[in-house]
Structures are given as C-alpha cells and as structure tokens.
C-alpha cells in the first residue's frame, strides 16, 4: 500500500500531516532526484495550481526542492489541472505538478503529478518518489542548481488546444449559457474560451480571493447554477470544480445533469457517428440505468474502481476512448490525456449542436434508477470502517434488502476522511430506508 499517495495524489488539511511546507519541500526534492536519475541534462518540471491561498506557499516549497535537486522549473500559475497535463506534454517537460485539492474547501490542499506524456503517474514512479522522500535532502553543487522561469503564453496555448477538440466550424452563437467556475482554476480561461466560440454568457464563481474556492459554487454545489439558469432563461448551465477536471451541467429547467447523464449523451452520439471505439467505462458507482440504456443501444459497458485513474487504466486496457464517473470526471481519450472539464463540456455541446437537441431531449433514452450517496465522517483511517464486524454485517443485510432490485456500496474515500455509502434501488422508499439503516450503523461505529 502507498504510504503517501492516495487515489488522486496527496491531499489533506493545510499545515497538518503531509500538507505542510516542509514535507512539500522534501517532495519536490524527491521528484527532482527521481527525474534526474540516468540522465546528463537537467530535468524540467511544470508547476501549476488552483486559486486557494495556500498554493503560493506550496509553489515556493516545490520550486525550492526541485531546484536544489538540479531540476529546472516553469511556473504556470493558476490553471486547470488538465491544462497542466496538456502543457507538460506540449512543452516537452519531464513532469507536471498541480497544487490543488480539487472540489475540497480552501483549507485543504494537495499535490498531484503528471508524466511527460501528460498522464497520471504510474505506481512504480510513485513508489520511487516515496522512497526518495525518505532519503537525505539533496542540494547539488551551485553550478548544477536548477533555474526557474514563468511561462507567459500558457492561457492562449490551452484555449487553442480546447477549441481544437471540436470541429473548426463549431460555434456557440445563439446559445445562452451559465458558467460556474467555482472561484477556481477555470475562472479566467473558461469565460474567455466560451465567448470566443460565440456564446452569450452569464458567469458565476469567477471572483477568487484565495478563500472562496468551491464555497457554495461549482460542481459540488449546483443550487446557485440551477437558480441562475432558471432566472436568466439560459439554455443550460455548466459547472466546473475547483481545479477544472470535472464538469456537471443543468438543463434549461435547472435539473442536474451528472457524469452518468453526460456519458450517455456522448456514447449514444459517438456510436451513431462512428467515433466511439471499444468499451465505455464507468465505475462501481455508475447508475444501473446507464448500463441498461447503453446495453439497449448495443454499446459495451464495464465498471472500473472508483477514481479517474482506474477509469483511464480500464480504457487503455480495453481500447476505449470514453469513460467517466457520475461526479463529472469524464475521459475523452481521443481528445485529451486526462479528465478535462472544459474539453468534456465542448464535446457535449458539439453533440447538441450537431443533433439540434436540447440537453433534456438528448437524455430521453436514459432512465436512471433512484440512487443516493451519503458521506459519514470517520475520525481514524476510513479504510478501517469496512473491516468492523458490525459494519460488515449491516452491509450484508443492506445488500440482501435490495437484491435483484438495486445495489449497495460502502467505501472509504481516497481523498477525504469519510466513508461513502451509496444505495440504488428501483423503489425510492426502499432505497432511502436501506441507506438510512446502513448509515446509522456506520455513524455509531465511527
């Protein structure tokens, strides 16, 4: 088991445990040493971040650790996570680092890495970095210290990359959209891009102050977006999370359109156009109704472990190009190397424009079963919850209660100190009763 890395890098409360300036300094030094092994030239690393205030502190710590190990650094500043993945590849860097805690509040932060190809690091490289952290801090001789510079054209590069993901003649003229940028990393780029494509925009969540990221806005708080869509008469709403790798939408009536819905819209249209390849990949949490709807269309569907890195792995293994999670992590591997909220939103909008459909019309063939998830806070290691006898027994009873009519999942979060409980069933009362009973047992055991 990894000592430091979770399902999406390293994440936690600022100033506690691993999310401290001294640890991040050592982490940067470890990365620099791993990248320098077996080469005569200095490795080059990109560093990007979201808008939370602690990003400045960790950016400086990473920079110092990398430079001390002899690595050059390019500072990108506030940019979406997928933009760092793209820039790492296109600028021929040896690695990319993102300072972000995604959809978490401002007092959390985290570090995630990308390979030279703009993909999440493999387990072997993560293990090498962890081993290097335990070694003494390295400062190379002065003449071999790394250099630091800022990249000035990152925004323009990423906007052109995103626009290139849709046909050249594609425009959004005549569409009124509400964009919710979560006061996060997309706050400046997303409005610029969608206006360049001709959309009439109403924007929310575009005034970051370092403390308001994800605060009542973004993909985890769709209430503001839904209300703004209804009040403004917009055609639909688009919400990103704090680092821009997730996207959710609302239709013109303000109804939530989650990642499962968006997967269906894309899979159905791409199959008809011939763009869909291989298998569509969801996760263990994907709604059963999605699996049924895709099956009706003759589209193969498999489930990976929860986490976009596992969806990516399953897509590569199955030769697929489309996958994702209900949370809004969508992978369009024929357009981007990682989950990209802006690129994914453009793919959905391109389908709607091509087919002449509204978002609600594009979803008419999907009938999801009632599903609900609750998070139960867990003071100790969340993984211990699933091993407790009373919790295991309650899980068995819950699964028996919905057998043949739904599914029950209980899993520790890979990014937060919570246990996630999900129940789906063909009857909403059965679903809620089963969820309540299981959640009560987990809370009592916490």
From Swiss-Prot:
PROSITE patterns: PGM_PMM. CDD domains: GlmM. Mg(2+) binds at residues 102, 241, 243, 245. The modification Phosphoserine is found at residue 102. Activated by phosphorylation. It catalyses: alpha-D-glucosamine 1-phosphate = D-glucosamine 6-phosphate. Keywords: Isomerase, Magnesium, Metal-binding, Phosphoprotein. GO terms for biological process: carbohydrate metabolic process; peptidoglycan biosynthetic process; UDP-N-acetylglucosamine biosynthetic process. Transmembrane segments: none annotated. Signal peptide: none annotated. The active site is at 102 (phosphoserine intermediate). Binds 1 Mg(2+) ion per subunit. One of its GO terms (molecular function) is phosphoglucosamine mutase activity. One of its GO terms (cellular component) is cytosol. Its cofactor is Mg(2+). Its EC number is 5.4.2.10. HAMAP family: GlmM_B. Catalyzes the conversion of glucosamine-6-phosphate to glucosamine-1-phosphate. Belongs to the phosphohexose mutase family. This is Phosphoglucosamine mutase. It comes from Xylella fastidiosa (strain M23). The lineage of its organism: Bacteria, Pseudomonadati, Pseudomonadota, Gammaproteobacteria, Lysobacterales. The gene is glmM.
């Amino acid at each position: 088991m990894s000592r430091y890395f979770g399902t999406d890098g390293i994440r936690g409360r600022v100033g506690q445990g691993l999310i401290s300036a001294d640890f991040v300094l050592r982490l940067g030094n470890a990365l620099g040493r791993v990248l320098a092994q077996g080469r005569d030239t200095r490795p080059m690393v990109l560093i990007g971040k979201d808008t939370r205030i602690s990003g400045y502190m960790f950016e400086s710590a990473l920079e110092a650790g990398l430079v001390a190990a002899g690595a050059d650094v390019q500072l990108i500043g506030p940019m979406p996570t997928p933009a760092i993945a793209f820039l790492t590849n296109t600028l021929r860097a040896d690695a990319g680092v993102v300072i972000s805690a995604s959809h978490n509040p401002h007092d959390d932060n985290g570090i995630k890495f990308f390979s030279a190809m703009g993909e999440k690091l493999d387990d072997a490289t993560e293990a090498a970095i962890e081993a290097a952290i335990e070694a003494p801090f390295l400062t190379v001789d002065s003449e071999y210290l790394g250099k630091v510079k800022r990249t000035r054209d990152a925004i323009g590069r990423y906007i052109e990359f995103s626009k290139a993901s849709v046909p050249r003649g594609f425009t959004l003229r005549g569409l009124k959209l509400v964009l919710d940028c979560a006061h996060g990393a997309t706050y400046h780029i997303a409005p610029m891009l969608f206006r360049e494509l001709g959309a009439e925009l109403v924007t929310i969540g575009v005034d970051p102050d370092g403390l308001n990221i994800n605060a009542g806005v973004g993909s985890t708080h769709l209430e503001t977006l839904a209300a703004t869509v209804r009040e403004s008469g917009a055609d639909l709403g688009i919400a990103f999370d704090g680092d821009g790798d997730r996207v959710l939408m609302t239709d013109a009536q303000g109804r939530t359109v989650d990642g499962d819905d968006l997967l269906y819209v894309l899979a159905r249209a791409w199959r008809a156009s011939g763009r869909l390849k291989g298998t569509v990949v969801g996760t263990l949490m994907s709604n059963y109704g999605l699996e049924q709807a895709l099956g009706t269309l003759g589209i193969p569907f498999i489930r990976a472990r929860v986490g976009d890195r596992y969806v990516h792995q399953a897509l590569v293994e199955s030769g697929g190009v489309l996958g994702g999670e209900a949370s809004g992590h969508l992978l369009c591997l024929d357009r981007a190397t990682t989950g990209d909220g802006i690129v994914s939103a453009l793919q959905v909008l391109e389908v709607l424009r091509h087919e002449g459909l509204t978002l609600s019309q594009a979803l008419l063939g999907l009938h999801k079963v009632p599903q609900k998830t609750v998070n139960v806070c867990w003071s100790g290691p969340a993984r211990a919850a699933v091993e407790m006898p009373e919790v295991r027994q309650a899980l068995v009873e819950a699964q028996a209660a919905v057998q043949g009519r739904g599914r029950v999942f209980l899993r520790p979060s890979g990014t937060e100190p919570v246990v996630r409980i999900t129940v789906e069933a063909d009857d909403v009362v059965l679903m809620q009763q089963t969820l309540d009973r299981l959640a009560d047992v987990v809370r009592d055991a916490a």
